[in-house]
From Swiss-Prot:
CDD domains: UDG-F1-like. The active site is at D70. This is Uracil-DNA glycosylase. It catalyses: Hydrolyzes single-stranded DNA or mismatched double-stranded DNA and polynucleotides, releasing free uracil. Its main location: cytoplasm. GO terms for biological process: base-excision repair, AP site formation via deaminated base removal. Keywords: Cytoplasm, DNA damage, DNA repair, Hydrolase.
Length: 229
């Protein structure tokens, strides 16, 4: 089980940034918890997909961070990228709203909910907590993942410049407010969460997709192609 969560699973650029986390006491406690959980319950995503966000978007290639909460807890949904589902899966409500805003903003219609194409272009689709029990939202909160993902965000803030942090909802905003206390050279886009409960409070109409591309263009970088083929 421990072999499933080794630093060797990460791209070299993330290994260099996160190597100290593997020796922290919280990490061995988290591993022990995960070993027990995967042995006795159905846990999402599959072990090999837990680090999919980091594997898909190496540290030196991150241009945008879209921060989620914890993985989808329905069967076959979570595959390691925040808000994303594998091809062929029905769109969860939050993702449906994300695609609705994308269409309003840029006229793009996406059918597949697999956001791998975004990750491949430098969009880090990172959840705050990387695992969950089937059918039990937030069941792995407070077990150590938050500290690990704090380290990820902190390394990006400290060791990269001009990353665009996209914070949808209070949880993402609160997490990053704590970490953004030092002066930094990054852009932050924030609005309510795309869930049906909050989307009408300001997520719809946020135009974050066009704003991200405006900022990238201003930096002289290639814009994100949000269309999923």
């Amino acid at each position: 089980m421990h072999e499933a969560f080794t630093i060797e699973q990460l791209p070299p650029s993330w290994q260099e940034q996160l190597k100290d986390e593997w020796s922290q006491p919280y990490w061995s406690q988290l591993l022990a918890f995960l070993k027990s959980e995967y042995a006795q319950a159905t846990i999402y995503p599959k072990k090999e997909n837990v680090f999919a966000a980091l594997q898909s978007t190496p540290f030196d290639q991150v241009r945008v961070v879209i921060l989620g909460q914890d993985p989808y807890h329905g069967e076959g949904q979570a595959h390691g990228l925040s808000f994303s589902v594998p091809r062929g899966q029905a769109l969860p409500p939050s993702l449906r709203n994300i695609f609705q805003e994308l269409h309003t903003d840029l006229g793009i219609r996406n059918e597949s909910g697999c956001l791998q194409a975004w990750a491949d272009q430098g969009v880090l689709l990172l959840n705050t907590v990387l695992t969950v029990r089937a059918g039990e939202a937030f069941s792995h909160a407070g077990r150590g993942w938050e500290r690990f993902t704090d380290a990820i965000v902190t390394k990006l803030i400290q060791n990269r410049t001009h990353v665009i942090f996209v914070l949808w909802g209070n949880a993402a905003r609160q997490k990053c407010n704590l970490l953004f206390q030092t002066k930094h050279q990054h852009a932050v886009l924030a609005c309510p969460h795309p869930s049906p409960l909050a989307a009408h409070r300001g997520f719809f109409g946020c135009c974050h997709f066009s704003k991200i591309n405006y900022l990238l263009k201003k930096q002289g970088k290639t814009m994100i192609n949000w269309k999923i083929e």
